[in-house]
A protein has these predicted regions:
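Core beta-strand elements of the Rossmann-like FAD/NAD(P) dinucleotide-binding domain
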Residues: 5-10, 201-212
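Generic hydrophobic/aromatic pocket-lining and core-packing "Φ" positions
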Residues: 22-26, 99
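Glycine-rich FAD pyrophosphate-binding loop
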Residues: 29-50
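Conserved redox-cofactor binding core of oxidoreductases
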Residues: 92-203
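Flavin (primarily FAD) binding-site architecture
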Residues: 215
Length: 215
């Protein structure tokens, strides 16, 4: 506590400026929450560009219909039934709506979503059943390409820009170069997480989330 130079309070604190963190931060802000997002680097970060979903508008547009229960069963089999089927089912039931939400954001910022042809998502002749869950790709706008670090894949540039700009427009307070170093918990470090200490030695800040901390 003696090393903390400032305490900042918001409704929600999100740790990490990747795809999940940006989506969480934007969703919370759009619901009226005051949100602070902490990112340890000097920019938002993305690693992948394959977005799996079931029954997104782009998939239905090309009549790509996936058997939800069969997909859930295959995912469970593939992970040797060590995963939580309720979580997998949550994805199967709601991923299409999430994909549509993301695509709407992308279109708002000048990027163009497009469906992925079914024959590009399954392997002919395989003995293992495949599921065409690759839901969409996006062509970036010129602004999105210019905003991305040099060498960024065009699809990734689209997603990166749409979610970052969406957060900015929703009022999310993005703090770059702000690595989380410690979580603060209630009840003598045994209860719920209520705050996060972030920053560099000599300039630590305590971010308190009155409604929640999202990792």
């Amino acid at each position: 506590e003696s090393e903390i130079t400032e305490t900042i309070t918001a409704d929600v604190i999100v740790i990490g400026g990747g795809m999940s963190g940006l989506c969480a931060a934007m969703s919370a802000a759009e619901e009226g929450a005051k949100v602070i997002l902490l990112e340890k680097t000097n920019q938002v970060n993305f690693r992948g560009n394959d977005y799996g979903a079931i029954d997104s508008k782009m998939q239905l547009q090309i009549n790509n219909r996936v058997d939800k229960m069969a997909a859930v069963q295959e995912i469970m089999r593939y992970n040797a039934y060590k995963g939580d089927q309720r979580v997998v089912r949550l994805w199967a039931d709601h991923s299409g709506k999430v994909a549509d939400w993301i695509m709407a954001k992308a279109e708002k910022y000048g990027c163009k979503p497009k469906p992925v042809p079914i024959d590009e998502t399954v392997t002919p002749g395989t003995t293992v059943r495949g599921f065409a869950t690759l839901s969409f790709r996006m062509d970036p706008s010129e602004v999105a390409l210019n905003d991305a670090p040099k060498g960024t894949d065009p699809w990734t540039a689209s997603m990166r820009y749409a979610l970052k700009q969406g957060c900015i427009d929703a009022g999310v307070d993005i703090r770059y170069k702000m690595p989380a170093v410690r979580l603060v918990r209630e009840n003598n470090n045994t209860g719920r997480v209520t705050a996060v200490i972030a920053g560099e030695k000599g300039a630590y800040k305590k971010f308190v989330g009155t409604k929640g901390i999202i990792l």
